[in-house]
């Protein structure tokens, strides 16, 4: 039972190329279903790992890895398909780099592991909702860009929140 959350995370990782195939081949419904299923499985494996007392070092690394790779894949493909502006992708990558580098610095310098907070979960949910909408619906590129700008602002606020909490 304690391995179930990690199995779900591994399945989510295996869904990434399936998602990419469907989105690249203009199967928006299938790509959207896979993306949403992966997003929901993230909620499920987090819940189960806490409920079953099955938090593991593997899960601590693999879970955020699966989330980021799925999100990055969606963003890259939406840009390549002309549904999102490239500058949004660049800003998101810079933000992710700062988040990862900052998290590693805090971990190694201050010996603190940053854990997920409510504001991080809200901004991640919003980002996934915007990406799902961009995948499933033929939204105007400008609309997706505006929604992604809101996601970027939320992510930056989240980054500031995590930094502030970590340095207290």
Residue ranges: model-predicted function:
Residues 1-168:
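Alpha-helical transmembrane bundles and membrane-interface segments of multipass inner-membrane proteins
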């Amino acid at each position: 039972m304690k391995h179930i959350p990690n199995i779900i995370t591994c399945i989510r990782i295996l869904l990434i190329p399936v998602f990419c195939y469907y989105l690249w081949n203009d199967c928006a419904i299938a790509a959207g279903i896979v993306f949403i299923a992966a997003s929901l499985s993230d909620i499920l494996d987090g819940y189960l790992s806490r409920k079953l007392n099955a938090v593991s070092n593997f899960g601590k690394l693999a879970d955020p890895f699966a989330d980021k790779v799925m999100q990055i894949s969606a963003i890259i493909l939406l840009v390549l398909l002309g549904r999102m502006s490239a500058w949004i992708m660049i800003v998101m990558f810079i933000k992710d780099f700062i988040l990862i580098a900052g998290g590693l610095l805090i971990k190694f310098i201050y010996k603190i592991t940053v854990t997920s907070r409510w504001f991080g979960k809200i901004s991640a949910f919003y980002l996934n909702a915007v990406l799902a909408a961009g995948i499933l619906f033929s939204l105007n590129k400008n609309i997706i860009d505006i929604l992604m700008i809101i996601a970027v602002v939320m992510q930056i606020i989240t980054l500031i929140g995590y930094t502030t909490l970590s340095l207290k």
